Amino acid sequence: MAMLPPPGPQSFVHFTKQSLALIEQRIAERKSKEPKEEKKDDDEEAPKPSSDLEAGKQLPFIYGDIPPGMVSEPLEDLDPYYADKKTFIVLNKGKTIFRFNATPALYMLSPFSPLRRISIKILVHSLFSMLIMCTILTNCIFMTMNNPPDWTKNVEYTFTGIYTFESLVKILARGFCVGEFTFLRDPWNWLDFVVIVFAYLTEFVNLGNVSALRTFRVLRALKTISVIPGLKTIVGALIQSVKKLSDVMILTVFCLSVFALIGLQLFMGNLKHKCFRNSLENNETLESIMNTLESEEDFRKYFYYLEGSKDALLCGFSTDSGQCPEGYTCVKIGRNPDYGYTSFDTFSWAFLALFRLMTQDYWENLYQQTLRAAGKTYMIFFVVVIFLGSFYLINLILAVVAMAYEEQNQANIEEAKQKELEFQQMLDRLKKEQEEAEAIAAAAAEYTSIRRSRIMGLSESSSETSKLSSKSAKERRNRRKKKNQKKLSSGEEKGDAEKLSKSESEDSIRRKSFHLGVEGHRRAHEKRLSTPNQSPLSIRGSLFSARRSSRTSLFSFKGRGRDIGSETEFADDEHSIFGDNESRRGSLFVPHRPQERRSSNISQASRSPPMLPVNGKMHSAVDCNGVVSLVDGRSALMLPNGQLLPEVIIDKATSDDSGTTNQIHKKRRCSSYLLSEDMLNDPNLRQRAMSRASILTNTVEELEESRQKCPPWWYRFAHKFLIWNCSPYWIKFKKCIYFIVMDPFVDLAITICIVLNTLFMAMEHHPMTEEFKNVLAIGNLVFTGIFAAEMVLKLIAMDPYEYFQVGWNIFDSLIVTLSLVELFLADVEGLSVLRSFRLLRVFKLAKSWPTLNMLIKIIGNSVGALGNLTLVLAIIVFIFAVVGMQLFGKSYKECVCKINDDCTLPRWHMNDFFHSFLIVFRVLCGEWIETMWDCMEVAGQAMCLIVYMMVMVIGNLVVLNLFLALLLSSFSSDNLTAIEEDPDANNLQIAVTRIKKGINYVKQTLREFILKAFSKKPKISREIRQAEDLNTKKENYISNHTLAEMSKGHNFLKEKDKISGFGSSVDKHLMEDSDGQSFIHNPSLTVTVPIAPGESDLENMNAEELSSDSDSEYSKVRLNRSSSSECSTVDNPLPGEGEEAEAEPMNSDEPEACFTDGCVWRFSCCQVNIESGKGKIWWNIRKTCYKIVEHSWFESFIVLMILLSSGALAFEDIYIERKKTIKIILEYADKIFTYIFILEMLLKWIAYGYKTYFTNAWCWLDFLIVDVSLVTLVANTLGYSDLGPIKSLRTLRALRPLRALSRFEGMRVVVNALIGAIPSIMNVLLVCLIFWLIFSIMGVNLFAGKFYECINTTDGSRFPASQVPNRSECFALMNVSQNVRWKNLKVNFDNVGLGYLSLLQVATFKGWTIIMYAAVDSVNVDKQPKYEYSLYMYIYFVVFIIFGSFFTLNLFIGVIIDNFNQQKKKLGGQDIFMTEEQKKYYNAMKKLGSKKPQKPIPRPGNKIQGCIFDLVTNQAFDISIMVLICLNMVTMMVEKEGQSQHMTEVLYWINVVFIILFTGECVLKLISLRHYYFTVGWNIFDFVVVIISIVGMFLADLIETYFVSPTLFRVIRLARIGRILRLVKGAKGIRTLLFALMMSLPALFNIGLLLFLVMFIYAIFGMSNFAYVKKEDGINDMFNFETFGNSMICLFQITTSAGWDGLLAPILNSKPPDCDPKKVHPGSSVEGDCGNPSVGIFYFVSYIIISFLVVVNMYIAVILENFSVATEESTEPLSEDDFEMFYEVWEKFDPDATQFIEFSKLSDFAAALDPPLLIAKPNKVQLIAMDLPMVSGDRIHCLDILFAFTKRVLGESGEMDSLRSQMEERFMSANPSKVSYEPITTTLKRKQEDVSATVIQRAYRRYRLRQNVKNISSIYIKDGDRDDDLLNKKDMAFDNVNENSSPEKTDATSSTTSPPSYDSVTKPDKEKYEQDRTEKEDKGKDSKESKK
């Protein structure tokens, strides 16, 4: 805000012809100046338009109201930037700014022509945009009609007319395209233009396919974006993120192309293999049959089809591929599956298949088809693609979108902060001016009245003054006083003003961001503000007038859950500390009102930043009251004649009328100026001063009123009717009720009721008995009654005014009202949905459950921020839905027989808008491939592919990832750890604490009673007793020191269980904010804080609160240790107590004690004397065992045994019975393993002792697993092996591999990270379950018992409802026929448990369509379903997917990533303690240290070799090779299945040419580079590829002849793809992304190992439980749990949650007729093929949660983390490449790699580098100033140069020195040769020596000259005077010479940098070397000087 415009109408000036002439004059002036100024640098900041006055924004507050005659009229531009540009502005009633070009529109209409003026008036009118908006919406509604009636044609014309009118108005008002702000200069208008042009084209010109052109009308929907302001920014963010995605997109396309080529080579033509019938009729051949096949029936006649499948069964020729059933053979014939669209036959289809794999859509189908056709070994291909392609690339897209959003967000926050600051400054300036003006007015009035009374003897001052002060101002003042009194008298104690203070306009982002404070300016100003001995409390000003304190700044600066009142209670005026937290949060302290505990109204007001004057000058003056007044450089008022109005003394302290505000004084100035008499004598000036005061007052009033939430009458009404204080009795009654209702126990009771009510609702199921139904109904009545009573009582206790100010209460009242309404309307048909509202009660739990609260907040915040994004998404969905309907609707209708046998529309079609919308929504969910096949079949491939890909990329990848990015950004680690609890939420904790205390008290009394009764002396140690005393003390005050001192005295942490709550939660009164450090800065300050009586403060004390300086040592131990591990927070001994003891076992070779101290103390027999006798022998045995166990070989042996025993489990598959020998070997092996593990356990017991063994979690794991083996061993020996329990125990052996966890470091790290994350994962899991519970109960209400249907069991089809309307009819049919069945869906909503399972299938989008179809077809309980009868049930699923799936599942990602980062912080050691600055240096040095100068490959001496060398090392050669690689790639893409012989030959020869070319390259390089060729990695890679290509070419025939496996041949052909990978070398962006992947690899390998372990265990479980289930759905002859390999194949598929519904379905068959419990399996003793539903559900759900949600998300977390690191690396000022470049240039200057270059070459070297290291010539002075060390021969070491150059880039820094020594040690180790050299001098010293030498020489010359002159002068003595002059002149000339040489010198000495120290030389040597060096230097100087 450079200029504060004068408030009121002065700012606005009509735009007239004079204005235009003035502008033209300014332009002419500017042009005349321009030629002179052209030389100015472009870097200088050009003036920019003001962001507040941009077109389209609201006019800033400060300009006040627009004078009546100026609305919608052309005005002069307010923005100074446009002063010399031909523009003018127009303001409409809503104060929106419109900017127009002042040149004639269309070359005809000047700004003053009536037509243009009318157009402008229409354009700026708010109704005009409303009209357009309504037109667009109506038009959209018409667009959704699929068969519009004829009359809509006319409506269409109307729309076109309106749009044309709109464009005409715009063109007339703005001009067409010449000049700024004209019609076509706004890109959004291009859209309108195109739409209108197309509308007319389609009308008047016949363009053929009209429907395609009509789809262009859809773009009109995009116009909504240009009309709604917030949307433009989101679209901006989207476009930004798409730009940022370019690199990732290129990488994705590149990777997919490579994978597609691999797929093409491996699986070309494989998917055409089918099972063909053997028995052909007479003389039929395959060819003849293929020619006759036409319809589906013909195909089914000859090929083998599975029931319900559309495609023939695939098979393969290799042993591990799918086999055909008997009577069929495998042939390659016919088309590919899925209408022929799924194949690897050409590059394009292979690319589509890979894209589908990457997006993981229905990929299990592709996986199964491919493995069936090619063989199971190719699973490896899928593993690589899923892990690299899918997980990595998709998440990179997420990472990029998230970063783009984050950057955009940061920018917005910064801008908003700036605005708030500017606004605040303006307000403060206005206030100050207002005060000054008022003071002047008062003084003037007083002066007038005194003069009058002198003259007339009468006092008429009052009337005179009232004339002067305007009436409105007076009214305002009165109103203000009234309001203040009213406000302060009303019950503000509850902090309700907080509710009023948030201004309506603030949005959540701003609110979140502002408490960050405006760091930079503030710190500086606060230092200036508070004088040393003065409390900041006294910085007062009108800023804190009472009126302001209740409603404040535009955006309230809310500190995190803390209010100032509590802070200022302990700040006493003299010594309060201005804590760092406050300066960080940026609020000024405010005096606290004594009658309020929590003065939240002040807390709101005070969060405004300090006033920063516009001109940057701030003077603070302390007046006689010690009040700091801020005097701003230009705050004084300007008078018309340019005089400053001085400040005024106001004699009496002006306090507000209201008594309660007497602490908040107005600013008084005691040291001010008096008004000059002549000034007051001037009546004009006086009048001016007073009116000025009133104007200012009005402006400030208006500003503040504009920020009120509600109009004033509302407050009057509220006070009258919503506060009930009728009579004293009523008030007493009210207090009683208040006391009861607000009691923590009542809260607890209500919470228990909520839980019970939820349970009651969750108990509904189908079928239910009548009694049960009645119980539930009565329960509902009771709970409704309880909640209604609670609401009524609270209303009485709090008054409606108070009650409705609390969010939770509003929520409660809504739910209670709805429940009551539902009770009355229970019997009305169709209103059963109201029952679902009861479910919202579950959310009341959030009040007392912080995580749920946080989740709701996160969703709330996101929805706030997502509002605009959701709108954009909705617009996109709408547009694509309409496009789909317009383009493909007809085709679906006409060609429906192609995709459906009975020629009816399928469920997913685009014939009408709703179905079209559903398809687009399904694509957004990531399911696009199946609907796309249908679309391609009916409407042609090209259009469908384009539309689907656009929806997929725009909708799914970009917008949905932006959703996720928003979610992740609302997750900051604070949210999870320090959940801000609302004080009321603690009521529950208080209640629980009371109960605990009661129980403890009862226990203690009982214990004491028993002890007394048995008259034993209690053996409770003193410490324990003291700790208990401490715990039960009921003192109300505790000082922050005494606690720590008591803790030191009593060692109360010894009693671990007592204080387990220590450090768990923060007491609400003790500290209001966890980051506050209010006493830490002042150790002597002791603060006493009231604590609620009877509440123990120990359990609420936070560890951080103890860390005040006085007890820092104790607290350090406490804090450091508590963060180290999750499990051991309590047993932290105090310093000096257990430290040594703990450290011992680490170092000693001796075992620890066997038993715990408690055992030894109780049972003296455990005490053994180890000095003598048996004890000594025992001790020696223990020591021997200890040595054995600790030996590394022992550990390796055990690991081997674990691996072998785990491996043995993998053999126990379905075929074990047939392999007798293996079975016997395994049985013996199992016994041996068991014995070995028992032995290991015993050894460890003896070696470590029970205490150590059983306090280690990993040992417990070992112990339990060994127990299982032991029990099964004993059972087998006793012959009980067939018992049920023993069998189930045997399956637990699958856990054996878990023992490997603790043995592998990598996996242990991951597991520890996971274990650390478990609490928060469980928390989120619970919250998700609660969230889903609501949907599950709703599902039960909607669908329970409605999924039954009557089916024909022969083909599984459903009888039409017209034939079989209900259950009874179906049963009648069943009696007649065997093939009829009344069957329920396996996964349904019959109870809450099954509801959860159904929701999980919907949320993972697996098997969800079947559930959805059943729901949409459902009619009623026991009724036969009808096709799409309840069509709008789709909406239930859409809503669930948005909230249940997008939000909650992504929340998991959020939690895991968050946790991951927190853990990293905990373990991250050094990184956290480095500043950003240090990190920069550290990273640069890290890179720098890893490099060293290499000798360039020498150019060979031989002439021919030399020429080849020049050719090969030329950049053009590299580029041409890259081009060849690309061409090679293209030729490989051309290859396809079934190509002609001719084409095959052409491609073969092309390939031969490429092989020759690449071989040629290889040979040329070998000739020229000789043995150096193999020193470069890429060359080796090329060499290998060339060799394999040649071998492959020659061996192709051999392989085909002898080894008939085409697979091997194919794999060899893949080698050619290796050449493509060389492209990566060239692209920097891609390299960054791959660098991120390389950085992730170690971590990803660990996670992969863990995933493999989980899969291994689950595979063994699966084999033992589900090996024999019936083969249907997803389980068949290849994909099953019969063998270990098959189980792994299935589990890999479910890792991405793909197809788990199909694998679960057969396991849910539990009884006939679904399965046969008596079925015999040949070769096995197992009977039946039924599954176990509960085990199956647990198995799959747990596996999905562990693998899909946890492990896979950790994978994502690692990638996101490393991506941000990699991008940081690439944006750092110095990257790897810069150092590489340095060394590349170095090689040219130092061909022998001596690591030195001569000083003379340095200048050229510095100029030869690329930026940022480049130092362009002239660079001599800069280089000398670097003070580089030189060795003999004036040579400088490369690292010294690099170090100095690096420092120059990164900037001088104090932290540099601390790191320097470390760095150099690293360089020394990397470059040993550096150690040996000793610098003699430095460049700076050398220069100084040179300069000294020239100075000495010149002095000597001057001296000689003088001598000569003297001699001459003595001869010519007569002309002495003249000679003297001459001499002086000469002297001066010499002095000048001398001075001229000095700038170099001063310039050189100005650098104070010292040369680097070389720490690897040991200190004494170093000192000696320093000494030698100085001596040498001195000698050198002496000798030089003597020479001279």
UniProtKB/Swiss-Prot annotation:
Lineage of source species: Eukaryota, Metazoa, Chordata, Craniata, Vertebrata
Gene behind the chain: SCN9A
Q: Which UniProt keywords apply?
A: Cell membrane, Cell projection, Disease variant, Disulfide bond, Epilepsy, Glycoprotein, Ion channel, Ion transport, Membrane, Phosphoprotein, Repeat, Sodium, Sodium channel, Sodium transport, Transmembrane, Transmembrane helix, Transport, Ubl conjugation, Voltage-gated channel
Tissue-specificity statement: Expressed strongly in dorsal root ganglion, with only minor levels elsewhere in the body, smooth muscle cells, MTC cell line and C-cell carcinoma. Also expressed in vagus nerves within the head and neck region. Isoform 1 is expressed preferentially in the central and peripheral nervous system. Isoform 2 is expressed preferentially in the dorsal root ganglion.
Known regulation of activity? Inhibited by tetrodotoxin. Weakly inhibited by saxitoxin. Inhibited by the spider huwentoxin-IV that binds the extracellular loop S3-S4 of repeat II. Inhibited by the spider protoxin-II that binds the extracellular loop S3-S4 of repeats II and IV. Inhibited by the scorpion alpha-toxins CvIV4 and AaH2. Inhibited by the conotoxin GVIIJ. Inhibited by the spider beta/delta-theraphotoxin-Pre1a.
Q: Where is the IQ domain?
A: 1889-1918
Q: Where is the composition biased (Basic and acidic residues)?
A: 26-39, 489-510, 573-585, 1962-1988
Q: What is the effect of changing residue 859 to T?
A: In PERYTHM; sporadic; activated at more negative potentials; slower inactivation kinetics than wild-type channels
**Which GO molecular function, any one, fits this protein according to its record?**
voltage-gated sodium channel activity
- The residue spans of each IV repeat are 1497-1795
Compositionally biased intervals (Basic residues): 474-486
Where in the sequence does UniProt note compositional bias of the Low complexity kind? 461-471, 1948-1961
Query: What name does this protein carry?
Result: Sodium channel protein type 9 subunit alpha
Segments dipping into the membrane without crossing: 347-363, 916-928, 1395-1405, 1687-1699
Q: Which residues carry this modification: Phosphoserine?
A: 1490
Its assembly, as annotated, is: The Nav1.7 voltage-gated sodium channel consists of an ion-conducting alpha subunit SCN9A which is functional on its own regulated by one or more beta-1 (SCN1B), beta-2 (SCN2B), beta-3 (SCN3B) and beta-4 (SCN4B) subunits. SCN1B and SCN3B are non-covalently associated with SCN9A. SCN2B and SCN4B are disulfide-linked to SCN9A. SCN1B regulates channel inactivation. Interacts with NEDD4 and NEDD4L; regulates Nav1.7 activity most probably through ubiquitination and subsequent endocytosis. Interacts with TMEM233; modulates the gating properties of NaV1.7.
Organism field: Homo sapiens (Human)
Name the reported effect of residue 778 to A: 5-fold less inhibited by the spider protoxin-II
